[in-house]
C-alpha cells in the first residue's frame, strides 16, 4: 500500500504537525512515564524533521479526559521524558487553549501541545477544531498508527486540510502488516484474548481470509453473557476457563497449542488469562512458548499483549510487535483504517 513519503517533501524551516501516540502508562507513585516505548517509536521521524530545521509541533493525547481539562491526563510527564530523550533540543510545552495559542517555535525546535482530548472537538471530529490545529502548521504527519482506527479530528480531518505524509513507524506498520494478508504463509491463525469486547468486532473481517481464530482471555465469558456477540463458524475455536476463572483450562491450552503448532502465520492480540494474578498466567506463558518454537511469521500487538510478552520474557519470540492493538486488528481484518484512508487522499 503506497502512502505519501515524508522524504519526498521539502520540509526545511516548515511548521510540521506530527500526530504521535503518546498514550503511555504512568507510574502511580510519581506520575512519571513508566514505559517510553511509544515515545521512542516517534523519535526517528522527529529527528528527521529536526535535521531539516523544521519547526516540529507534536500533537497527542493521554487517557480519556472526556473533553475536560484534567491534570491527571496532562502530557507534562511526556514533555519531561522527551527532554530526557532529546537533551540537545529545545522543547516547549504549550498548555494554553488553542484559541489563545500563539506558538513561537523556532527552526530546529519542538513544541508539544497539551492533551488534544482536553477539547471535545478532538473526539467529536470537529472541523472547527481541526482547522484550529491546521492553522498552526504547514504540513501534517501521522505517526500514531495505534490511534488511526479512530475517526478523530487530528486523525482524519486534519490531514485533509494540509499537505501530509506518513511517519516512518506508521509506514513500517503498514508494510509489515500488509505482508501478513497480501501473501500469507498458511495456515493463518488469529489468537484473540484480553477483556475488550471491541476485539470481537473484527472477527467477520478475519473470517474472509484466515484459517483459524482462537478466542481466549475473558472474551468467551462475554460471549456467553451476550449471545448476540457469538459468531458461529467452523474456523472459530472457543476457549474454556479453568475453575478459578482466571485462566484457560488445560484442555483449551492443549487444543490451542495443537492448532498453533501447524500455523504458518500467527496474529496475537490479548493475553489468554488474567496475568496480573499468578494463577492466571499459565496459558499465556505456554502459548507464547509454543509460538516461539515455530518457524512462522509471528505478529503481536497491543499494550496488554506486549506487557504479557515482556513479563514472560517472550518478546524475542515474536517477529513483529505492532504499536496498535485494535488498530492492528482492524487493519488486518478489513485492510484499511480511517486514518490510513485520510493519508491516501
Where are these regions (language model features)?
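Active-site loop-to-helix "anion-binding N-cap" substructures in soluble metabolic enzymes
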Residues: 1-345
Amino acid at each position: 500500500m503506497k502512502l505519501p513519503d515524508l522524504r519526498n517533501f521539502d520540509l526545511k524551516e516548515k511548521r510540521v504537525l506530527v500526530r504521535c501516540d503518546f498514550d503511555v502508562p504512568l507510574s502511580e507513585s510519581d506520575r512519571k512515564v513508566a514505559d517510553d516505548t511509544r515515545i521512542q517509536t516517534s523519535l526517528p521521524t522527529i529527528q528527521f524533521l529536526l535535521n531539516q530545521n523544521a519547526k516540529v509541533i507534536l500533537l497527542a493525547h493521554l487517557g480519556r479526559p472526556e473533553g475536560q481539562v484534567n491534570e491527571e491526563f496532562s502530557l507534562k510527564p511526556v514533555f519531561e521524558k522527551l527532554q530526557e530523550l532529546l537533551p540537545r533540543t529545545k522543547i516547549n510545552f504549550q498548555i494554553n487553549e488553542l484559541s489563545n495559542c500563539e506558538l513561537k517555535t523556532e527552526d530546529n525546535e519542538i513544541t508539544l501541545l497539551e492533551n488534544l482530548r482536553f477539547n471535545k472537538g478532538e473526539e467529536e471530529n470537529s472541523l472547527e477544531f481541526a482547522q484550529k490545529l491546521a492553522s498552526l502548521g504547514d504540513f501534517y504527519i501521522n505517526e500514531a498508527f495505534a490511534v488511526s482506527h479512530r475517526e478523530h479530528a487530528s486523525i482524519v480531518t486534519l490531514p485533509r486540510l494540509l499537505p501530509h505524509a506518513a511517519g516512518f513507524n506508521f509506514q513500517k506498520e503498514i508494510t509489515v502488516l500488509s505482508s501478513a494478508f497480501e501473501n500469507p504463509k498458511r495456515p493463518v491463525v488469529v489468537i484473540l484474548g484480553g477483556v475488550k469486547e471491541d476485539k470481537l468486532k473484527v472477527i467477520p473481517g478475519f473470517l474472509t481470509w484466515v484459517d483459524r481464530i482462537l478466542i481466549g482471555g475473558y472474551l468467551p465469558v462475554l460471549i456467553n453473557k451476550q449471545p448476540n456477540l457469538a459468531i458461529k463458524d467452523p474456523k472459530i475455536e472457543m476457549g474454556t476457563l479453568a475453575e478459578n476463572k482466571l485462566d484457560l483450562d488445560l484442555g483449551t491450552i492443549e487444543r490451542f497449542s495443537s492448532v498453533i503448532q501447524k500455523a504458518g502465520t500467527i496474529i496475537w492480540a490479548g493475553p489468554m488469562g488474567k496475568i496480573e494474578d499468578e494463577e492466571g498466567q499459565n496459558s499465556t506463558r505456554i502459548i507464547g512458548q509454543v509460538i516461539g518454537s515455530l518457524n512462522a511469521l509471528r505478529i503481536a500487538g497491543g499494550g496488554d499483549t506486549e506487557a504479557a510478552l515482556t513479563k514472560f520474557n517472550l518478546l524475542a519470540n515474536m517477529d513483529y510487535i505492532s504499536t496498535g492493538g485494535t488498530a492492528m486488528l482492524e487493519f488486518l481484518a478489513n485492510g484499511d483504517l480511517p486514518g490510513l484512508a485520510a493519508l491516501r487522499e
